[in-house]
C-alpha cells in the first residue's frame, strides 16, 4: 500500500511540474496550417500553378532572342564575310537578333492563358481545402485531449473519495464496529482506482503525442493544451444548422466546391484551345545580323622574282608566222607578317556596318491532315468537360450526404448527452444515499464500492458524450464555412 501511495504521489508531482506554455485551439490550428507537410506540399503546387499562369500570359507577347559568336578557323574554310575559300587562319565574330510573334490562331494563346490562370486559382482552393481538413482534425484531436484530461481529474477525485472511505473504514475496524473484510475491500478498490488513474493519465499522454504528430511538433518538446471552460464553448442551436440551409451555404463556401466550379470553367476553355488546332496559324518573324572576320596575317608588299611560265609547270608558247614564242609572266612573292592583337580588330566597326542585314517575314500554317490529332484533341476536351461536370456533381452529392449525416450525428449526440446527464444525476443520488447508509453501518463496503463505480462510469460517459456533442456541432459549423470557433 505504501508503494501505491508513492506511485500516485509521483504522478501528481509530474503534473504539478508541467508548467510549459499552454496551447489553445486557435494556436494549434494556426501552427498546423503553417507547418503541416500536406499543407506545405499543396502550397508548393499552388505556387507552381501560379508560375505557369504567369508564363502563359507572357506567351501572347513577341519572343526576342540575341546571339553572338567569336572564334578562329584553321585550314581550308569559307570566310563568313567574303564567302571565299581561304587557307589562312582568321578570326571571326557574328551578332544576331531575332524575334517572332503569333498573330492569329483562333485565340489559342489567350484561352491557354485563361486556363492556366483558372488552374492556379483552383490550386489555391486546394490549399484551403487541406487547411480546412487539418483544422477540423486538430479540433477533433484537441477535444480528445481535453476529454482525456478531464477523465484524469475524475479518476483523481475517485481516488480521493476512496481514500476518505479507507480512513473511515480503518477507524471503524480498529474500533471493532466493522470486520477487517470491509477494510480489505476498500483497499482493493483503491488499487483499482489507482490503476484507472494510471490508465487515464497514460491515455492523456498518448493523445498529446497524437496532437503533436498532427501539428508536426517534436514529441521531445514539452507540450500542454489550454483547458477552456467547457460550458462557455459557444454552441449554436439546431435551428441555425438545418441541413438544407447548411448545404446551400456549403456549396458557396467549401473549397472543394469552389475548386470544382473553377476547374469546370477551365475545362470549357480548354475546349476552345483544342479547337484552335483546327484553324490556321499566322505568325511574323524577323532578324538582324552582322559579322566580322580578319586574317591573323597581313600583307606588307611583294618581291619581284623574275619571269616564269604563264602556267606553272607548263611551257606556254604561241606560234606566229611559223615562229614559236614562249609566253612568260612576272613572278612575285607576297610578303606577310603576323598581326598583333590590336591589328586583328582593324575595320571591326566598318565591317559590321557593311555586313549588317535585316529580314522580316510572315508565315501561315494551315492544318490539312495530321492523322486526326486535332480532331481527337477537340473530342477529348469535350469529354473532359462532361467528366469534370460529373466529378462536380458527385462531390456535391457527397457533401449533401455528409451534411445530413453530420446533422443526424449531432442530434444523436445531444440525445446521448441528455441521457448521460440524467444518468450522472441518478448515480450521484444513489452514491450519496449509499455513503450515508455506509457511515451508519447499514450498507456493506462492497455495495458502496458498486455505487461509487457506477458514478465514475456515468461521469466518464457524460464527459465523453459532452465533447462528442461539441465536436459534432462544430462539424456542422465547419460545413457552413465558418471554421472552428472555440
Locations of regions flagged by a protein language model:
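Periplasmic alpha-helical coiled-coil/stalk elements that build and connect Gram-negative outer-membrane
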Residues: 133-249, 409, 413, 433, ...
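Bacterial Sec-dependent N-terminal signal peptides
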Residues: 1-25, 36, 484-486
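Transmembrane beta-strands of outer-membrane beta-barrel pores
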Residues: 70-74, 103, 288-292, 366-368, ...
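Hydrophobic, lipid-facing positions within transmembrane beta-strands of outer-membrane proteins
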Residues: 93-99, 246, 358-364
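Acidic, low-complexity, intrinsically disordered peripheral segments
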Residues: 74, 219, 296-306, 340-344, ...
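Bacterial Sec-pathway N-terminal export signals of envelope proteins
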Residues: 18-69, 75, 219, 226-272, ...
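Sec/SRP-type N-terminal targeting helices
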Residues: 40-44, 57-58, 89, 103-131, ...
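Short segments within alpha-helical structural elements
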Residues: 44, 58, 195-217, 421-482
Amino acid at each position: 500500500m505504501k508503494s501505491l501511495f508513492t506511485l500516485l504521489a509521483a504522478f501528481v508531482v509530474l503534473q504539478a511540474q508541467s508548467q510549459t506554455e499552454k496551447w489553445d485551439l486557435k494556436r494549434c490550428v494556426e501552427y498546423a496550417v503553417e507547418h503541416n507537410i500536406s499543407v506545405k506540399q499543396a502550397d508548393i503546387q499552388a505556387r507552381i500553378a501560379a508560375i505557369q499562369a504567369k508564363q502563359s500570359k507572357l506567351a501572347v507577347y513577341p519572343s526576342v532572342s540575341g546571339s553572338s559568336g567569336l572564334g578562329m578557323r584553321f585550314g581550308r574554310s569559307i570566310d563568313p564575310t567574303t564567302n571565299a575559300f581561304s587557307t589562312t587562319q582568321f578570326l571571326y565574330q557574328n551578332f544576331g537578333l531575332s524575334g517572332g510573334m503569333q498573330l492569329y490562331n483562333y485565340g489559342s494563346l489567350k484561352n491557354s492563358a485563361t486556363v492556366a490562370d483558372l488552374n492556379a486559382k483552383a490550386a489555391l482552393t486546394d490549399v484551403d481545402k487541406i487547411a480546412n481538413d487539418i483544422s477540423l482534425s486538430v479540433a477533433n484531436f484537441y477535444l480528445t485531449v481535453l476529454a482525456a484530461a478531464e477523465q484524469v481529474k475524475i479518476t483523481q477525485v475517485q481516488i480521493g473519495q476512496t481514500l476518505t472511505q479507507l480512513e473511515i473504514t480503518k477507524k471503524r475496524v480498529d474500533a471493532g464496529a466493522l470486520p477487517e473484510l470491509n477494510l480489505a475491500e476498500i483497499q482493493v478498490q483503491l488499487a483499482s482506482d489507482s490503476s484507472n488513474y494510471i490508465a487515464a493519465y497514460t491515455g492523456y499522454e498518448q493523445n498529446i503525442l497524437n496532437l503533436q504528430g498532427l501539428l508536426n511538433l517534436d514529441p521531445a518538446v514539452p507540450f500542454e493544451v489550454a483547458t477552456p471552460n467547457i460550458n462557455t464553448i459557444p454552441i449554436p442551436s439546431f435551428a441555425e444548422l438545418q441541413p438544407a440551409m447548411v448545404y446551400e451555404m456549403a456549396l458557396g463556401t467549401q473549397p472543394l466546391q469552389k475548386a470544382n466550379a473553377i476547374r469546370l470553367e477551365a475545362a470549357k476553355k480548354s475546349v476552345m484551345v483544342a479547337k484552335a488546332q483546327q484553324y490556321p496559324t499566322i505568325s511574323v518573324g524577323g532578324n538582324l545580323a552582322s559579322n566580322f572576320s580578319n586574317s591573323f596575317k597581313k600583307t606588307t608588299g611583294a618581291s619581284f622574282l623574275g619571269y616564269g611560265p604563264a602556267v606553272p609547270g607548263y611551257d606556254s608558247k604561241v606560234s606566229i608566222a611559223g615562229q614559236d614564242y614562249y609566253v612568260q609572266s612576272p613572278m612575285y612573292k607576297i610578303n606577310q607578317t603576323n598581326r598583333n592583337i590590336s591589328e586583328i580588330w582593324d575595320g571591326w566597326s566598318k565591317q559590321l556596318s557593311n555586313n549588317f542585314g535585316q529580314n522580316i517575314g510572315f508565315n501561315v500554317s494551315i492544318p490539312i491532315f495530321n492523322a486526326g490529332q486535332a480532331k481527337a484533341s477537340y473530342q477529348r476536351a469535350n469529354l473532359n468537360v462532361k467528366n469534370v461536370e460529373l466529378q462536380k456533381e458527385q462531390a456535391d452529392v457527397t457533401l449533401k450526404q455528409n451534411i445530413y449525416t453530420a446533422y443526424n450525428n449531432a442530434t444523436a449526440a445531444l440525445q446521448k448527452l441528455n441521457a448521460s446527464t440524467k444518468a450522472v444525476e441518478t448515480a450521484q443520488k444513489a452514491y450519496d444515499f449509499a455513503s450515508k447508509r455506509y457511515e451508519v453501518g447499514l450498507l456493506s463496503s462492497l455495495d458502496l464500492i458498486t455505487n461509487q463505480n457506477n458514478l465514475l462510469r456515468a461521469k466518464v460517459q457524460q464527459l465523453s458524450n459532452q465533447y462528442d456533442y461539441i465536436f459534432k456541432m462544430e462539424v456542422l459549423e465547419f460545413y457552413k464555412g465558418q471554421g472552428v470557433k472555440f
